[in-house]
Design a protein with these regions (language model features):
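Generic secondary-structure signature for well-ordered alpha-helical cores
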Residues: 37, 64, 68, 92, ...
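A short, small-residue-rich loop immediately preceding and capping a beta-strand
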Residues: 91-129
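Short glycine/serine/threonine-rich phosphate/pyrophosphate-binding segments
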Residues: 29, 52-56, 81-84, 106-113, ...
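A glycine/threonine-rich phosphate-anchoring loop and its flanking beta-alpha core
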Residues: 20, 116-219
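Active-site segments that bind and position negatively charged phosphate/pyrophosphate groups
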Residues: 205-207, 211-330
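ATP/NTP phosphate-donor binding region
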Residues: 1-98, 334
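C-terminal charged capping/lid subdomain of soluble metabolic enzymes
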Residues: 2-8, 314-396
Length: 396
């Protein structure tokens, strides 16, 4: 017998999207020039000054060795319209064939926003495994200056042409970034299920207008299976990968988590859709200036995931998530998010932002600002209660 989702799918046009190439391995960055020369003879390389100091030499030597000219642009830390316009001007003035984004999610989102609308090849080289930005056709835009507030998420008509992940580079990054990637990735198991149950689309579209996808296509059931594999991989390898990251070494578990954080997570969210966890995670950015220390995307989404689990899955699943999250160091309370003096006014700011997100539109139910605030407060109390039973591991 066919399940209801399969039967319903006969009435829809469905779609699936993915990056053109995904390449991962220890030391692969030294082959970057060989890999990208298929896209042309001249590149714009975008990274911040710290990343250039760490891996810029390997990137530049590889491009020179394989005959790829390049102009190196230092990223200004925030993926904003101001920064996108600045880098686009440099790319067009130099007649480059490709944009190579080297660094974290904001760098790569900026590189995509420069390359894809201008029909340049987009090559993503993550130096941390903290988000699924490398594989997706989405850029998240923030205000200036850094750290900015969330403005919008824009959709592109194609995914990056290539993603090159050097696990030796990933292993040398602070272990916190790996945990953040897992925090982002774990949300997709719950969000994909919620989106399917609501019969809503993901981020695959028939057409694109004004940086927006229009005529969304319904997903196949593949994202559900990817999200399940993703969550199982995080549970099986997360703790061991964190130990490897703390020691700055590449192990099979670290390879599996990098693959999960980057490829599996990207395929799951883009084809399966995002929901309440990301609505809350993104909206918590309105409180970033109060957070001490500043929290990363995956940390805020981890708290959002706890809220979604309590709203849709119940206490048993919430406790399982808290235990796992604390085992790798992720926050599950306001205090762990660096919000030691959070007020109702603060939470209502978050709630109003939640209701303005595209993720909110994918919910199977309507929730008021009062309900969103109440859900966050409940998640905080549950996080405090059960977090004591499963102490939070340090990142380093």
């Amino acid at each position: 017998m066919f399940d209801p989702i399969t039967i319903a799918s006969t009435f829809y046009i469905r779609g699936f999207r993915a990056p053109g190439n995904y390449i991962q391995g220890r030391g692969v960055l030294s082959y970057l020039g060989k890999l990208v020369k298929r896209y042309g003879r001249k590149a714009l390389v975008l990274s911040d000054s710290d990343v250039r100091r760490i891996v810029g030499g390997v990137v530049e030597e590889s491009l020179r060795r394989f005959g790829v000219e390049y102009v190196y642009v230092i990223f200004n830390r925030e993926c904003s319209w101001e920064e996108i316009n600045r880098v686009t001007k440099i790319a067009l003035e130099n007649s480059v064939d490709m944009v190579i984004g080297v660094g974290g999610g904001k760098t790569m989102d900026t590189a995509k926003a420069v390359a894809i609308p201008n029909e340049l090849a987009a090559v993503m080289v993550p130096t941390i495994a903290s988000t699924d930005a490398p594989t997706s056709a989405v850029s998240v835009i923030y205000t200036e200056p850094y750290p900015g507030e969330f403005v919008e998420a824009i959709n592109f008509h194609r995914n990056p042409d290539m993603v090159v992940v050097d696990t030796e580079v990933i292993a040398k990054a602070p272990a916190r970034f790996l945990a953040c990637g897992m925090g982002d990735a774990a949300s997709h198991y719950w969000e994909t299920r919620a989106v399917f149950q609501a019969n809503k689309p993901g981020y695959v579209f028939m057409d694109y207008e004004n940086r927006r996808g229009v005529e969304p296509l319904k997903p196949f059931d593949l994202p559900l299976h990817i999200a399940k594999l993703l969550w199982e991989t995080l549970q099986k390898h997360g703790v061991a990968a964190m130990h490897a990251a703390k020691l700055k070494i590449v192990t099979p578990s670290l390879e599996q988590i990098v693959y999960a954080n980057t490829l599996l997570s990207g395929l799951a969210f883009e084809n399966g859709g995002t929901s309440l966890a990301h609505a809350i995670g993104n909206s918590l950015s309105v409180l970033e200036k109060k957070m001490k220390p500043l929290q990363y995307h995956g940390e805020m989404v981890a708290f959002g995931t706890l809220v979604e689990i309590l709203a849709e899955g119940g206490l048993e699943y919430a406790v399982e998530f808290i235990k796992w999250a604390h085992s790798i160091g992720l926050p599950v309370t306001f205090e762990e998010l660096g919000l030691r003096d959070v007020t109702d006014e603060d939470l209502y700011k978050v709630a109003e932002k939640v209701k303005a997100t595209s993720e909110y539109q994918r919910l199977a139910y309507e929730i008021s600002s009062d309900q969103i605030v109440a859900m966050m407060k409940v998640a905080n109390e549950i996080g405090k209660k059960y977090g004591q039973l499963y102490p939070r591991a340090p990142y380093e």
